[in-house]
Amino acid sequence: MARNWSFRVIFVSAMWCALLKFATLEEPKDGYDYTEGCPFVVLGNGTHAKPAGCSHLCNGAPETLDDNMECYNVTEEVAKRMTPDIPYTCWLGWCSKGECKRDNRTEVCYRGSERE
């Protein structure tokens, strides 16, 4: 009886691993190529993250985020100099033509550690 039980555990484990492999290899269905470009610097607030600014240079070419995307009104240079895991007060804004247009709201934000 113990032999039959161990076979079932091994079989279920193998099936679970196969399912995970195929589930994680699936390509995104939105048509966007996530392998191109340079990642934007993001700052967190404990529940989600937003980009620092709305544009940057990627291999000498400008990249901009879509209009009406929420952002932190902080340049990437300033965000990179922030001490990791220390809370800061950041102005919120909305991307408009590559610029984070500040509104009258602030929230706590922080730069994550490099290991994240």
Curated annotation (Swiss-Prot):
- GO molecular-function terms, A-Z: C-C chemokine binding
In terms of domain of life, where is this protein from? Eukaryota
Among Gene3D superfamilies, the record links this protein to: 2.30.130.100
Name listed for the protein in its UniProt record: Evasin P1180
So which residues are the signal peptide here? 1-25
Gene Ontology terms, cellular component aspect?
extracellular region
Positions of disulphide bridges: C38-C58, C54-C95, C71-C100, C90-C109
Query: Where do the record's glycosylation annotations fall on this chain?
Result: N45, N73, N104
Arranged from A to Z, the UniProt key words for this protein are:
Disulfide bond, Glycoprotein, Secreted, Signal
Pfam families attached to this UniProt entry: EVA_Class_A
Its biological function? Salivary chemokine-binding protein which binds to host chemokines CCL2, CCL3, CCL4, CCL8 and CCL18.
Q: Which InterPro entries match?
A: EVA_Class_A
Task: Indicate where this protein resides in the cell.
Answer: Secreted
